[in-house]
Amino acid sequence: MAERNLLKLAEVQKRTALSRSSIYAKVAAGTFPRPVKQGASSVWVDTEVQGWIDALIAVRDQQHAA
């Protein structure tokens, strides 16, 4: 199994260039990976966040190629 790391909200914001409210709105809409509860905090699985980013890039590349 691939190694997975957990990301705090600040790191997710940095990697995605999204605001806190945008991240949670996308989670609520089902278009962004759901966080994992770690005590009172929420964290995200790094491979899931990277997969979301990769999917955006793939859509862009498909549109550009068409």
Can you say where each PLM-predicted feature lies in the sequence?
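Minor-groove-contacting beta-hairpin "wing" of winged helix-turn-helix DNA-binding domains
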Residues: 41-45
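C-terminal secondary-structure termini that scaffold catalytic or DNA-interacting sites
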Residues: 58-66
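Beta-hairpin "wing" of winged helix-turn-helix
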Residues: 35-37
